[in-house]
Regions:
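S-adenosylmethionine-dependent methyltransferases
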Residues: 1-200
Length: 200
């Protein structure tokens, strides 16, 4: 099955541009045609922060091998899937939106990995289970940034510079990728996307 519909959104199975080991059901709509200010829309794409973090995990599997990994605000599930492929013993993907939950399940299945999927608002997530917490391109507001920083450890993030209050973290980034995006998918053709420890 190469095409599915979730919540009136048509998703097509396609290899991820910068992580070709993984194929996902994704929207063909350009990013600027998705309401990125509405976090409930963001599950349709593999954003560059998620792609960068997935790439880093697959290239450095020792970070996750044999561990329990928690992917926060999982979206399409790319980071969770990468962690499982890289050898994580257990992967928990958390998102609070039902279409995202459906999408993660379908994407895990097409990549032949088992992921525990939890539908819950991250601000209500009380479990302390997890050897490593992962976030791919999650920070669009300061509230989530502060909450995650204070609640979970260790936390590894993949993200371009989206908001000024965490620019200082990029001074200690452990990897930077310049990731291109398809023409028309954003206002720019590429992003410098950083991997960094929010807490460790």
């Amino acid at each position: 099955m190469t095409e599915i519909t979730i919540k009136d959104k048509i998703l097509r199975l396609q290899p991820v541009q910068h992580v070709p080991e993984i194929s996902l059901y994704l929207s063909d709509s350009p990013h600027h045609k998705i309401n990125t200010e509405d976090r409930f829309e963001c599950w349709q794409q593999a954003w560059v922060g998620g792609q960068a973090l997935a790439r880093y995990i697959l290239d450095n599997p020792e970070l996750v091998a044999g561990k329990t990994i928690v992917d926060i605000a999982s979206g399409c599930g790319i980071v969770a899937i990468a962690a499982k492929i890289a050898g994580a013993a257990r992967v928990i993907a958390i998102d609070d939106y039902e279409p995202a939950i459906q999408c993660i399940g379908l994407n895990a299945g097409i990549n032949n990995v088992e992921i525990e999927i939890v539908q819950e608002d991250i601000f209500n997530y009380s479990s302390d289970v997890g050897d490593l917490f992962l976030l791919g391109d999650p920070f669009y507001d300061e509230q989530l940034f502060d909450y995650v920083q204070n609640k979970f450890t260790p936390v590894l993030v993949g993200s371009p510079i989206r908001l000024p209050y965490y620019v200082s973290y990029y001074n200690s980034s452990i990897q930077t990728y310049t990731l291109s995006v398809p023409p028309g998918f954003d206002e720019t053709n590429s992003f410098d996307t950083h991997i960094w420890w929010l807490s460790e």
